[in-house]
Amino acid sequence: MPLEIIAMEQVKMMANKLWGGRFDKAADGEMYSFLSSENVALDTALIAYDIEGSLAHVCMLAKQGIIAKKEAGEILSALAAVQKKAGEGKFSLDPALEDVHTNVEAAVTAITANGKKMHTARSRNDQVSLDTRMYMRVAINEVSAALLELQASLLELSKKDCVFPTYTHTQVAQPASLLFWCHAHHCEIERDLERLSQLYARVNECPLGSGAVAGTTWNIDRNYTAKLLGFSAPTANPMDSVGSRGELEAELLSHLYLAMAHASKIATDVILLANKRLIVLPDEYSTGSSMMPQKKNPDPFELVRGKASRMLGLYVHAAGLLKSVPSGYNLDSQESKYALLQGVKTAEQSFSILAHALPLLKFDKEEIVLELEKGYACATELADLLAKKGVPFRSAHSVAGGIVKECIAKKKFLSALSASEVSAVAGVKITDAELKEAVSVDKVARFSAAYKIPAASAHAKALEARVKALDAAHALLEKEVKALVK
Ligand code: ARG
């Protein structure tokens, strides 16, 4: 995504042809560059959607008799020519034309003068809202696919199941298993996917026909354009449609932030456990030091964590645009495009990197057992064993705490205790087998039996259905366009 400000020392313009009727002087070059140079760079991501939206709009204008079928046919074939050029990457946006909407209209009008009729009954305000919703639908689907890939990589990783530590307050807590850890993160991502699915339904309403703010008195058919573009329905209120630009973007970024926070948690666990030498980092996803030859650094994992912070910034940026603006359309909302495009790219890259790196992790089981032993990770099990023998839990907790204190002083692990020692301190009879069962850190099955990662998330099906619906709409639009282009 090209984000650089295009150098435009001075864009000297005649009073703009698009809206210049009531102006005497040309727009100031610096002002124009401020408005448009970054904007057209961002709008490049919207070209395909803008053209598709125009195809549907023109089909509707013809169907409603607002323009003649012959005129529509000419506009549609000009749009198809621009679409082809854009598909080949040969359609670049001119900042002097402000945005993608005007660039497309100008390109069409250069092919056929009927292009001047294309903008009947719409505004760039409903157009940009349409384009960004269409972009967001694809983005939500692509990010969901990346999250599903991350879930699949957790499933893959869980096949290396072994005993695994858990922590609270970054201190060793209780033993668990690698599967248990993978399952926990799988659950987090399931919620991320659910949030995205729910948002998709809100995004999937068509604002086209809302006009600048108050709709239009032309006899348009909003249901028809909504259908041609694969939306579930038209939006309900024109002022809300143009005025809520940025809201869905902020919502998406907030969901992406939560998903990035989950990715960051996974990455941080990997960093910390590699630091303790329990995890061996894959060569393919680590870097070295330019000075210290022995180093193997978890750079991509750190960068995922760093990018979670960027995502929070992008969310705050988009959310901030929503307050203090009055009803209707305001150009402040143009700023949400930057946050949206950056956020989607950042999320996709981060989830993909993690998905590829995780299955390559290796585990040092001896070190893991040592970590758990050193952390007296089975002390809760020991207290529970005493409680099961009739000692009130609070007293059992105290006895087990005393045993841990003693062990620390004697530099001894819980697994080295004898049943007679424990029985004597606790005042209840414990057998060797019972004690062993309680204080063995490596009973993997015990920690894995209850957790199963599903082979396919329910959200994979929902994603498939959404993609299918978009494909079907594409086919329908193509059919309608063909009927008019002779
Ligand atoms: N570039 C604008 C945006 O992204 C498109 C709508 C412009 N509308 C206007 N009245 N200036 O929001």
Regions found by a protein language model. Give the residues of each.
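Helix N-cap/coil-helix junction residues
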Residues: 66-67, 231, 391, 412
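Charged, flexible cofactor/metal-binding loops and thiol motifs
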Residues: 133-139, 144-145, 159, 165, ...
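Short, well-ordered beta-strand elements within core beta-sheets of diverse protein domains
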Residues: 59-67, 180, 250-258, 381-390
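A short structural micro-motif
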Residues: 77-85, 243-246, 402-407
